[in-house]
Amino acid sequence: MKTVLLVIKVFLLASMVLSCATSSNAFREIDHAVDQADFTAAVDAVVRGQRGHRGQRGSRAIYTERNAISLFMDKGLLEHYAGNYAASSEDLQNAERLIEEAYTKSITENFFSFIINDNTREYPGEDFENIYLNVFNALNYYNSGNTEGALVEIRKLSQTGGKLDMLARRYDYTDPETGASLNDIAQRETGIRDLPEIASVNFSNSALARYLGALFYQANGNIDSARIEFNQIELAYRTNRNIYRDSVPRAVEEARNVPAGLARLNIISFTGLSPIKQEQLIAHYLPFRHPILQVAFFKLPVLVKRPSVITRIEVAVEGAGSFRLELLEDMGAAIEETFSGRFSSIVQKTYIRTIIKYAIADITAMEMARQQGELAGLMIALTARTAMDISESADIRMSRYLPDKAYIGGINLDPGTYSVIINYYNGNNLISRDTYADVVVDNNGLNLLQSVNLR
């Protein structure tokens, strides 16, 4: 009896910790500002959502101490969209630092999370966040006039041993001595034979990162490195079919071969909002003796799409013509692909944790039924199951303001100054328009115009 009471107390304590979990409703103010493309107001709303901010009650804080990575990611992205590149760079660098530190956290904290719930530890960040923060920080550097700094960010992703290279291998780990996979190791350590398998991740090359790298190398006069990056775009399309389902955009080849005497105006546009995590209940049969404990409901984080209303983007350059932007990278698909490996790991960990909890409860309930009757056993089983269900919640923390898609296009022009209009359509209906006056197009450097529409 003392054992089950102790177990229940632990689970109820965990439920108190998790009761402050943030729901998507808490982000309404930020989401509204983003929908209105008022990114400065969105940043202000994020700041108000920090724990400890003046006037913000701790129990209502959106970004707690355990969710610092999401804070820096959200704030850094929104600062970028608002054109505050220095502030954005600082925030994204903080997010990157915390993600790196999360990999080296003590095994004690990880063990506690293993027994209770992922929400009991600091949010470690997702693989896709660790990748795309470098893309946007590269654009921060470029927009601040620092092309070399932009290339440093891109090389963090693309070089041998970089983030994309490591991601491709992380979930295909094998023990160098025994050749055991992650699944084999988990089964050996837990003794549970029917564990869900950890999926591999097929995202080892980013056309978006390669495209930006090629343009930055061109701007620095490093033609050979630019050639390699352009070639890597084609390789990314061939080897990552879950993400790149169409042919390489024509704009890639056009940017690669600009006629002598002309200057290239390149356009990159980010649209929509990437998928976000939501909690999903999944029922699963467990082979325990007490009927109350034979069905468990796993609470798992699943990605849910946020469809964009934008179906077409057209660019008009005054006196030079118009062209349509082409999809370069489905960032939402890349996010889903990179999350698949982590999701499998989460399912496996949740499964193990649930088995352990229910096994303790089943043993205690059956023993109580034997000693004091079926009603006593039923009460123990019901109480334990309720406590366990309360103690569980899916970890839905993540960055909410990554774009869903990246489009590119461009036009070869005589060097000069132009007016540029970017039109966003839903079918034949004009949704919004970005106008850029006095755009200087020079044949001695990179002419990259960036637009964002997250609707």
Please report, for each region that a protein language model flagged, where it lies by residue:
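Boundary/linker segments of alpha-helical solenoid repeat arrays
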Residues: 54-66, 99-110, 161-172, 234-252
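Bacterial Sec signal peptide processing site at the extreme N-terminus
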Residues: 16-41, 50
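Residue-level signature for tetratricopeptide repeat
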Residues: 32, 71, 78-79, 140, ...
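C-terminal soluble interaction/assembly domains
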Residues: 366-455
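Extracytoplasmic/secretory-pathway proteins
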Residues: 157, 175-406
